[in-house]
Amino acid sequence: MAEITASLVKELRERTGAGMMDCKKALTEANGDIELAIENMRKSGAIKAAKKAGNVAADGVIKTKIEGNYGYILEVNCQTDFVAKDGGFQAFADKVLDAAVAGKISDVEVLKAQFEEERVALVAKIGENINIRRIAVLEGDVLGSYQHGARIGVLVAAKGADEELVKQLAMHVAASKPEFVKPEDVSAEVVEKEYQVQLDIAMQSGKPKEIAEKMVEGRMKKFTGEVSLTGQPFVMEPSKSVGQLLKEHNADVTGFIRFEVGEGIEKVETDFAAEVAAMSKQS
């Protein structure tokens, strides 16, 4: 067995753009023959995948599944809506979710490692960067899920609720985007930040500080209600809050998770005409 030196790994990395571990693995399998390693990487799609790795994958799908007292929610990204609807991409996302459920996996890095070879092969086949972005698990007595198309997925856990109520609550979370379950769950950091913003606004109106502070107290109560599930008007019956609805059913929400495709990912806007012009100058 030939020695796989750091300089050899570095050279292969520079020539292919692939990751260090992928290069080391390819060289080991090729017994230190760099040309054979490159040929094998081309065949496996590893080089193509490495070139696509820098592309922003902000489209994709959300998948949910409930198994017993555990709910699973997964986001897998690609670059375009077209690929998000592709059968091969959808099947890959389903397979990843099934593996998470079967193994009770809540660590996305474990899933990434498990499916890296399949991901690389799919990138080579489809021609877009693909990323297993995140996985979350929710435990509860009664679980419900809702999917708004493939782009928004919600899990809700509750006590004392039936499946229909939990499904309606999941639909509400999808539409109203609460950040917390109850107003008292809003973190001190979030409250303080909003308080300072509202106080600055009130002070700019020329009111004395004492009056401005009283105004802000009322606004803060409204704010914590707006960002919490139980404080929001129920989307299917806005005359009552979600908190009132739960009280009527003698039920309680213990947690929820809401995923939306691409949230938090900065999408690069491309000027197609400029891109074509740039490519023509290079050729």
From Swiss-Prot:
Gene expressing this chain: tsf
Region (Involved in Mg(2+) ion dislocation from EF-Tu): 80-83
Similarity annotation: Belongs to the EF-Ts family.
Pfam families: EF_TS
Stored SUPFAM superfamilies: Elongation factor Ts (EF-Ts), dimerisation domain (SSF54713), UBA-like (SSF46934)
Superkingdom classification of source: Bacteria
Source lineage: Bacteria, Pseudomonadati, Pseudomonadota, Gammaproteobacteria, Enterobacterales
Family matches, as NCBIfam families: tsf
One Gene Ontology molecular-function label: translation elongation factor activity
Entries under InterPro entries matching the protein: EF-Ts_dimer_sf, Transl_elong_EFTs/EF1B, Transl_elong_EFTs/EF1B_dimer, Transl_elong_Ts_CS, UBA-like_sf
Keywords for this protein: Cytoplasm, Elongation factor, Protein biosynthesis
Localization per Swiss-Prot or TrEMBL: Cytoplasm
UniProt organism field: Klebsiella pneumoniae subsp. pneumoniae (strain ATCC 700721 / MGH 78578)
Protein name in the entry: Elongation factor Ts
Major localisation: cytoplasm
Function: Associates with the EF-Tu.GDP complex and induces the exchange of GDP to GTP. It remains bound to the aminoacyl-tRNA.EF-Tu.GTP complex up to the GTP hydrolysis stage on the ribosome.
Gene Ontology cellular component annotations, sorted alphabetically: cytoplasm
